Structure formats: C-alpha cells, structure tokens
C-alpha cells in the first residue's frame, strides 16, 4: 500500500448531538461512585527481584542480634553450663554463620537451576552439602 503525505485539515466545527454527550457523561461517572479503587500490586516476581538486588548490595547482618545470641547460648549450654560471651565473640559467630548460609544458598540455587527449576527445595540443600563434603 502506498504511503500518502498527511496534510493538516481545517475542522468544520459543529455541535455534537446531545444524546451522545449524555451517554458519555453517564459512562464516566458510573464506575467512580460505586467502585472502590483496588490497591496497586506488582507482578509476581518483581518484588522478589527488587529484594534480591537490595540484599546483594547491603552488608548489614540479616539475622536479628538478640535471637541469634539466645540460640548461641542455648547451644553452648549443651557443652558447658555458665559460659559467658563477649559481645564481639557473638558478632563474630553471627558473621561466620551468615557467610556460611549465604554461600550454602548460592550453591543450593545452582543445584535448583541445574535441575531446570527456579525454586530451591530441601533436596537442593542436601545435594549442595553432599557435594561440599559436609554430609556423606
């Protein structure tokens, strides 16, 4: 089909029929009176990707300090009672634990991707630990 040059045309104004304007106005006003505006929702996966980028940029500890400290004390009681911890010792344990978990989740994600999945499963964690030689 040949392309034609568009030229400006002068509009020949005139009044639109009253019935058409009335129906347009009725259509515009109808949904606003009875309808409640739905809250905005992002598409599935958008927020997850945003969180991934946020946590990959950050360096702060992700596990809360007090619950981790209680866990350390609870585990330490099995070996020796009345143990005391310096605050720096608990922080060092937390840094090491989080570094280990991040690495484990990276390997777990690779196992899931290898299985042509995007969701990690317990079997991926088990495989990652088995390959690392942590659990025979």
From Swiss-Prot:
UniProt KW keywords: Acetylation, Chromosome, DNA-binding, Methylation, Nucleosome core, Nucleus, Phosphoprotein
Gene Ontology molecular function, alphabetical: DNA binding; protein heterodimerization activity; structural constituent of chromatin
InterPro entries reported in the protein's UniProt record: Histone-fold, Histone_H2A/H2B/H3, Histone_H3/CENP-A
Composition bias type Basic residues, residue spans: 1-15
Residue positions where N6,N6-dimethyllysine is found in the record: 5, 10, 28, 37
Stretch list, region Disordered: 1-42
Localization per record: Nucleus; Chromosome
N6-methyllysine carried by residues: 5, 10, 24, 28, 37
SMART domains associated with the record: H3
SUPFAM superfamilies: Histone-fold (SSF47113)
GO cellular component: mitochondrion; nucleosome; nucleus
One Pfam family of this chain: Histone
Modified residues (N6,N6,N6-trimethyllysine): 5, 10, 28, 37
Reported tissue expression: Expressed in roots, seedlings, leaves and open flowers.
Residues modified as N6-acetyllysine: 10, 15, 24
Coiled-coil segments: none
Residue numbers bearing the Phosphoserine modification: 11, 29
Record's function text: Core component of nucleosome. Nucleosomes wrap and compact DNA into chromatin, limiting DNA accessibility to the cellular machineries which require DNA as a template. Histones thereby play a central role in transcription regulation, DNA repair, DNA replication and chromosomal stability. DNA accessibility is regulated via a complex set of post-translational modifications of histones, also called histone code, and nucleosome remodeling.
Family named by the database record: Belongs to the histone H3 family.
Quaternary structure annotation from Swiss-Prot or TrEMBL: The nucleosome is a histone octamer containing two molecules each of H2A, H2B, H3 and H4 assembled in one H3-H4 heterotetramer and two H2A-H2B heterodimers. The octamer wraps approximately 147 bp of DNA.
Protein name in UniProt: Histone H3-like 3
């Amino acid at each position: 089909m040949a392309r034609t040059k568009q030229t400006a045309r002068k509009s020949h104004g005139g009044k639109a029929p009253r019935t058409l304007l009335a129906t347009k106005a009725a259509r515009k006003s109808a949904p606003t009176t009875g309808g409640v505006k739905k809250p905005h929702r992002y598409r599935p996966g958008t927020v997850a990707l945003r969180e991934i980028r946020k946590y990959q940029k950050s360096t702060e500890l992700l596990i809360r300090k007090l619950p981790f400290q209680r866990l350390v004390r609870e585990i330490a009681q099995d070996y020796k009672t009345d143990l005391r911890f310096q605050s720096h010792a608990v922080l060092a344990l937390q840094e090491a634990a989080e570094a280990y978990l991040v690495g484990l989740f990276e390997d777990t994600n690779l196992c899931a991707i290898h299985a042509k999945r995007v969701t990690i499963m317990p079997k991926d964690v088990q495989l990652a630990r088995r390959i690392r030689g942590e659990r025979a």
